[in-house]
Amino acid sequence: MENTKELERLIVASNNKNKLREFDAILGHLYSVVSMRDAGVDADIEENGVTFEENALIKAQYVMEKTGCAAIADDSGLEVDALNGAPGVYSARYCGRHGDDEANNDLLLENLKDVPAPRTGRYVAAIALVRPSKAPIVRRGTCDGEILFERRGQGGFGYDPLFQCETGETFAEVSMETKNAISHRKRGIVAVLEELSKEQA
């Protein structure tokens, strides 16, 4: 796969430190991963799409237009089957405030209190790569699991302490290496890279 010149510097359309760390861990050996703030874009981009894909595209497009450089963005969240896919695109602000992980987890537990195990669901990440003068690439990655009855683990962020993945551990218990090998974000990024590879073949 060609990964020189045009994509050597890749701006992540986020200032979320946790997401940036994951993007860098997954893509850092291929590209110089830069946050949008470090690229000179300091904005709170309005995510008004109704799907993960729309929101990811909105963010990547905004940063690409501001910088003229390739930008990658994700929009991710948790879909719980017993809640008809909620919290979904509202995962980060499920409790009504943006980014309050504790309150979001509390509300999720409350809304699932009468639901027996297995409480199935999945993490979803839509990844959008937007480049000047080229068609955007948007792909989705998922990671199936179960929602536990109480938090486990000290790592991760978001709903990670309640999300038990295929290893039997929560995303807050697994190592960063394990999470980055199986996560929804990794799978979405790999799907984008595969499409990019086809385009450049």
Task: Locate the predicted segments by residue.
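Anionic-ligand binding patches
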Residues: E2-I11, K17-A201
